Amino acid sequence: MDLCQKNETDLENAENNEIQFTEETEPTYTCPDGKSEKNHVYCLLDVSDITLEQDEKAKEFIIGTGWEEAVQGWGRTSPAACIWPRKIPKKARVGEGACSDCLVCVNLSHWSLQTKPPTEGGPEKDQSSPSQTQAAPQGPSTASRAISDICFPTYFRAEKKSLQIKEFIWCNKDWAIPGTNRGKASGNPSGGAHRGLSIPGPLTSRALLVLPPLKASLSNALDVLGKKSKNSFLQSEEKVLDVEKDGCVAYAYGLKTADGKGEKRASELAKHPMVNDTPSSPSPAAQISLLTDPEQRCLHWSLLSEKNLACPPDPSNVRYLAALQLLQKRGVQSYKSKFKAKEPRSPVITRKHVLPKAKQENRPQMLETKVFPRPVLPSLTVSRVIIPVSTHRIL
């Protein structure tokens, strides 16, 4: 038994020695003097004090608006909470403030309580007067009422709505029957809530003078538009008819001066339907301007055939036409006789002389057939043919 106990004690001692040996081998950071730890703590405290002083100095130069706290979420108040859109607050209780979140409203409430004297006036002043007179016994309730009045003042919204509706209905009645409504408005006694809403008589007369009724204005506007469209259409038709009538008058005038057949053609012009429908006659200035210049009045007679002539020519032009017709007949005959007389005199006919003669014979026919359906311009064709062609070369 003793041996067993001795072995156990030896084992326990050995274990204790091993533990002590490991503890001795671990590095110890203890200093001989404890001043270093204290100095370190003091340094940290000094740094914190310096930072606090710097922060306080910075806050002194910056006006505190509360925006930093509102953005970072450190505070529960904002400088202009009443400006932001939010729900309409409920009625404040006796011990609660209606706008406790708004710093501006709190400052205004304190200032209003100090400066405003108790006065009696309208319904708003009647409500604020008992809160100011009973400021000593009921401190929190008066402050809350003043704050609520500043942030969200009560404007008697029911009366405001009734004012708008009453004005609207009254205006409609005035437009329909102005005389009866004026009598009703002057005769009906107004209530206490609507004493300031009674409308005088001159205002209604001014409104009626300035603003016409809507139905009449719409009908007048439509009539004016219809008249404008009709006038524009009639003016365009009159212009067309005047131009046609001017042309026809010029044509009739030319017929009478040109030939004796003008009477027959003038009767045909009288049957024209458009001239008979015209209500107004053309101005004399337009007739003079059309009849003075014969070139402007109609195209040149030599460029068109007799059937297609729009206006007859002057007497001088008629004489010239007759002369040209005579020249045409005589010129062709003389040309043929001269050409036949010259043919036997030519001793030798070469190919060079035959080709231009054949061309000369074919030229007037081509001009007459292709360019002019009838020989209206013989002078142009004959002038090229009548020139005698010498068969012998001149040395």
UniProtKB/Swiss-Prot annotation:
A single Gene Ontology CC term: nucleoplasm
A Pfam family per the record: DUF4529
Domain of life: Eukaryota
Alphabetized InterPro entries for the sequence: DUF4529 (IPR027836)
Region spans: Disordered: 115-144
Low complexity biased stretches: 128-141
PANTHER family reported for this sequence: CHROMOSOME 16 OPEN READING FRAME 46
Protein name: Uncharacterized protein C16orf46
Gene: C16orf46
